[in-house]
């Protein structure tokens, strides 16, 4: 588990006009330095763990600030923790105070989807998710309600798979709920990328281990901003990407790296500008100094930046209203 966390933290991405995400010891030292002087900060962390997936309603809101971020934990606890580290990094840049946040995470999702243990086949994984998706949606809606009752004023969900049900989770809620696909699309649009093939459309590659659930919403959100999303063909997915995941589960890191490099190259030769690594399993596989990572994006970086931007905008709006009155 610690090895997986380390791989996630060491993932180095260089996205558009933003500086590369800090990695390894430098990243941890910065986070520790930023947080050391903030012991009295209003940032709050609520990790609620309930095997049943039920949440006790708080008597009063934990936080009352209008820029409080609510983080809905997904299938992977490690991914949630890495996202919180991203929030801390971007939220405390230039000496700023990290916005307050409250988090809800529990082991019920992995249990519902039976994703623990040996790597299931793609078909088995798909069947398990489809069979239990109603329970998953209810679990995530309970988390949303818990966060709202705890004082969250905006929501983020650092889980690619959970975003497949973003619209269902956000029903009957008035809170702003950022979508990772929108965040990526907006950053790509602001980067003003130039097409590198004759058709004149900027192509973005997508690698995911849950293409049946994840690919459609990335295609929808990016196509709405004028991008073409390019996926692996079925043969390459079955003979390259799936074996890469199998190698990773066998702890054959070098084998997984070589296969992932092949998958990325397959997309690059199809004239994509960048490749989205839209899977927790894919992040951190390549070493942080691998030149291929300059062509890869962790979509959760875009979600973290957009979340911090929302929180900072809320503060500016309130200050503007106070100044006017």
Residue ranges and their predicted role:
Residues 1-325:
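Non-catalytic structural scaffold of enzyme domains
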């Amino acid at each position: 588990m610690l090895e997986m966390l380390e791989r996630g933290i060491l993932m180095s991405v260089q996205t558009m006009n933003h500086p590369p995400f800090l990695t390894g010891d430098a990243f941890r030292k910065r986070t520790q330095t930023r947080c050391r002087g903030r012991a009295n900060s209003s940032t709050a962390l609520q990790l609620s763990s309930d095997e049943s997936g039920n949440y006790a309603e708080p008597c009063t809101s934990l936080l009352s600030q209008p820029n409080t971020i609510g983080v809905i934990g997904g299938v992977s606890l490690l991914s949630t923790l890495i996202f919180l580290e991203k929030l801390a990094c971007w939220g405390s840049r230039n000496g700023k105070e990290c916005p307050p946040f409250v988090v809800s995470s529990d082991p019920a999702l992995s249990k519902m989807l039976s994703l623990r243990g040996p790597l299931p086949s793609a078909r088995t994984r798909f069947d398990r998710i489809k069979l239990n998706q109603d329970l998953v949606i209810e679990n995530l809606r309970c988390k949303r309600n818990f966060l709202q009752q705890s004082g969250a004023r905006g929501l983020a969900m650092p889980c690619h798979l959970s975003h497949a049900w973003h619209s269902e989770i956000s029903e009957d809620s008035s809170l702003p709920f950022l979508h990772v696909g929108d965040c990526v699309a907006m950053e790509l649009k602001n980067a003003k990328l130039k097409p590198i093939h004759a058709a004149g459309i900027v192509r973005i590659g997508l690698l995911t281990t849950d293409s049946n659930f994840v690919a459609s919403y990335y295609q929808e959100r990016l196509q709405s901003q004028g991008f073409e999303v390019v996926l692996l063909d079925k043969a390459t997915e079955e003979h390259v990407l799936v074996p890469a995941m199998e190698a990773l589960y066998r702890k054959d890191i070098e084998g997984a790296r070589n296969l992932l490099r092949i998958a990325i190259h397959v997309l690059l030769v199809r004239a994509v500008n960048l490749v989205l690594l839209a899977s927790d399993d894919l992040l951190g596989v390549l070493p942080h100094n691998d030149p291929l990572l300059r062509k890869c994006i962790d979509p959760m970086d875009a979600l973290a930046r957009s979340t911090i931007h929302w929180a900072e905008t809320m503060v500016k709006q309130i200050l503007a209203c106070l100044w006017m009155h």
